Amino acid sequence: MSAFEVYRRKFKPALPRAIQGASYHLHTEEKTHPVADEQDIAALFPKTTHLPLLDIQPDTGAPKLLEPKRVGVIFSGGQAPGGHNVLCGLYDKLQQIAPKSVLLGFQNGPKGLMTNKYVELTEKFLEPFRNMGGFHAIGSGRDKIAKPEDFDAAAKTAKDNNLDIICIIGGDDSNTNACLLAEDFLKRGLKTAVIGVPKTIDRDLYSTKGIECSFGFDSSTKVYAELIGNICYDCLSAKKYWHFIRLMGRSASHITLECGLQTHANICLVGEEILSKKMTSRQLFEYLADCVTKRADSGKNYGVCLVPEGLIEFIPENNELFAYLNNTLLPHWTGELTADAVAAKLPDPLRTTFMAIPASIRTQLLLDRDPHGNIAISQIETEKFLGAGVQQVLRERGSKTKFTPLYHFFGYEGRCAAPSDFDCSLCYSLGAVAAILGCNGKTGYMASLRNLVRPPADWSPIGLPLTCLMNMEMRHGHKTPVIMKQMTDLNGNPYKLLARNRDTWLMNDDYQNPGPIQQIATESAEGTAVCARPTITLIEEARK
């Protein structure tokens, strides 16, 4: 264990004032409704739809200790900084409100739950993982509880281990699984409560009803922003490269937007804006070429451009092209597969779209296929797609502008980072909220916290019904209940802050280097230290 890890284990995560002790009460608030498709959701989830929101408030009465509980917990999906503190917060709160409770960590995600593979999480077991990054205490996985036999297996595990609670720590798909499992257990008459915890660095698991920020977003964006800040200063020092930096976020641009606000990169592309303007690939290349040319005209043949990894899928014409290739043309293809041969077989509008894609990327599209033979959109290097597009436009214009692109992808660097103070306390508090909800027999709820721009003592713990996040979407040709992903709000304050400063940041070298995550308080006043500051996104969203 490194000197840093030894030091970091000593940090004491903060809890909201309402749940610092063992005296609290659950206040029932308004009945909730699904975010869309209410009739369909209510028909599929008759036992958990329209549950009330629960506000956990402090109680001045004597602590009411509960009987020991048997609790299972899993990580589901990709890693995010702070996950281990959810386990620690869950364990510590269980021992406080239901002494001698047993916590079982099912290994490697939902598969561990279905196969009954677990390790008991004790004080001694958890000690090395407090305030540490990663999910390696019990591992994670992307298996889904989807088939009837999967639900049977999960129910068998719950019964065999006499579980009172199962806590699922994951993103939108994982919490959709939690919602399905809660409903299934109620239909079976099982006593096991199912509680979800919101995890995703992408921050597409968000709700105005009570999810202000999923854990991991704070730490990961601060890691990426540090790296981007370093590149900005390198860019300013060398004055000869354009850096195209792809950032995680296939479905939403929250990470890219936050990093742009932290670093003042010259260009920060927001996929949702491109979608709203119905931009074509060619229009995007033209815009970027204009930006490069404007800076070059000012003697600046360098810059930094931030790109969400899912950008290509925000361009409407690309989705039409990919759908036609995957569903109509490629399944019946015979003979040599070349870009020219494919172009000759495409109808006119789609041929134009295909030929607007740089030649090197066209070849990659056809060669990189998933196991089903479809174009592997997630494998497209978006930053190179844009850089090649700019080169193509400049070449067609006969421009003498000097343009030397360099490419970066920041993704896995941030998923298992040592969590920030914010994420340490957020995760620890989420674990505690999950324990309270489950120990009080609540099922089909997500543990959450409000007022996150305040110091942790002022955070408001709540239980949010999972069904109020649900809608129906087409998956594999069928309408399926899922938690709705939340995209970047183009009417929201964070985006407006970018829009107001976009032209200035493009032309000026107004770079900011936020530096590494600060983990030592430098001011005495609570909440004023650099290490205590939340993201700019949260601060801006809290502004009225």
Curated annotation (Swiss-Prot):
InterPro entries: ATP_PFK, PfpB_PPi_PFK, Phosphofructokinase_dom, PKF_sf
Feature type site, description Important for catalytic activity and substrate specificity: 173
Site (Important for catalytic activity): 199
Source superkingdom: Eukaryota
Binding site for diphosphate: 78
EC number: 2.7.1.90
Record note on pH: Optimum pH is 7.2 for the forward reaction and 7.0 for the reverse reaction.
Activity regulation details: Non-allosteric. Competitively inhibited by fructose 2,6-bisphosphate.
Predominant cellular place of this UniProt entry's protein: cytoplasm
Keyword terms, alphabetized: Cytoplasm, Glycolysis, Kinase, Magnesium, Metal-binding, Transferase
Active site: 202
Enzyme class, first EC level, given as a word: transferase
UniProt-recorded Gene Ontology molecular function terms: 6-phosphofructokinase activity; ATP binding; diphosphate-fructose-6-phosphate 1-phosphotransferase activity; metal ion binding
Binding partners and assembly: Monomer.
NCBIfam families assigned to the protein according to its UniProt record, in alphabetical order: PFKA_PPi, PRK07085.1
HAMAP family documented for this protein: Phosphofructokinase_II_Long
PANTHER family: PYROPHOSPHATE--FRUCTOSE 6-PHOSPHATE 1-PHOSPHOTRANSFERASE, PYROPHOSPHATE--FRUCTOSE 6-PHOSPHATE 1-PHOSPHOTRANSFERASE SUBUNIT BETA 2
Function comment: Catalyzes the phosphorylation of D-fructose 6-phosphate, the first committing step of glycolysis. Uses inorganic phosphate (PPi) as phosphoryl donor instead of ATP like common ATP-dependent phosphofructokinases (ATP-PFKs), which renders the reaction reversible, and can thus function both in glycolysis and gluconeogenesis. Consistently, PPi-PFK can replace the enzymes of both the forward (ATP-PFK) and reverse (fructose-bisphosphatase (FBPase)) reactions.
Record protein name field: Pyrophosphate--fructose 6-phosphate 1-phosphotransferase
Organism: Giardia intestinalis (strain ATCC 50803 / WB clone C6)
